A protein has these predicted regions:
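Mature, Sec-exported extracytoplasmic domains of Gram-positive
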Residues: 7, 76-77, 93-97, 141, ...
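Glycine-rich, aromatic-bearing surface loops/beta-hairpins
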Residues: 121-177
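N-terminal capping segments
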Residues: 1-72
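Generic preference for flexible, low-structure residues
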Residues: 27, 31, 56, 60, ...
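...with weaker cross-activation on analogous glycine-rich loops/strands in unrelated enzymes
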Residues: 61-136
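Residue-level marker of positions within ordered structural domains that often coincide
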Residues: 20, 44-45, 111, 125, ...
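Residue-level signal for functionally critical sites in structured catalytic/ligand-binding pockets
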Residues: 35-42, 48, 103-107, 118, ...
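Short, solvent-exposed loop/turn and secondary-structure capping segments
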Residues: 53-56, 118-119, 148
Length: 177
């Protein structure tokens, strides 16, 4: 497998372009539980250009009804990215606020039910990151440049994207916009 560096600029540019709109290449899951992780996955794909088409446990989108749980589900997105096994697709580590960069992801528990419910992408951060100067873009409560401090969360976790693995013989089509 080949390592693919994460193109943070491409991920953030995609986030800015589609924060208040919907890319017609992807279904809008807003009325089916929310579109935040679908949007986060689109941003991540814009920055890596690779998917993992393993049924059930991969990370991919083909159509509205042919996608992995990790493409649209908050906990499955986390599980896929932080899995320690080396496999095709992007990977990340859970980190703290001081380690995040634009293009990384945040997961928030908003409902107080002990489950993470929301996945924004970080688009900007201050020199010393804080809840006031880490700014995010998201769907399901569409936002761009929204400070983390403005969310009424009960728990938060950060996902620092390290890159992706891709098979050298299978370059995938890359269409960030």
């Amino acid at each position: 497998m080949n390592f693919v560096p994460y193109n943070r600029r491409a991920a953030v540019a995609y986030a800015h372009r589609w924060a208040y709109d919907r890319n017609p290449r992807f279904y809008n899951y807003e009325n089916l539980g929310g579109d935040c992780t679908n949007f986060a996955s689109q941003c991540l794909y814009a920055g890596t250009g690779t998917m993992n088409f393993t049924p059930t446990f991969g990370w991919y989108y083909k159509t509205a009804n042919d996608k992995s749980p990790s493409w649209t589900g908050v906990p499955y997105f986390y599980n896929f990215l932080t899995d320690k096994d080396i496999r095709i697709g992007p990977f990340a580590i859970e980190s703290d606020i001081l380690s995040v960069l634009p293009g990384d992801f945040v997961q928030l528990e908003l409902t107080g039910d002990d489950t993470f419910d929301h996945t924004p992408i970080i688009v900007e951060r201050g020199e010393v990151p804080s809840l006031d100067n880490v700014l995010v873009a998201a769907h399901s409560q569409d936002a761009d440049y929204r400070p983390l401090s403005s969310y009424p969360f009960t728990r938060i976790r950060y996902l620092h994207v390290l890159g992706a693995w891709r098979l050298p013989s299978r370059p995938e089509p890359f269409w960030p916009f």
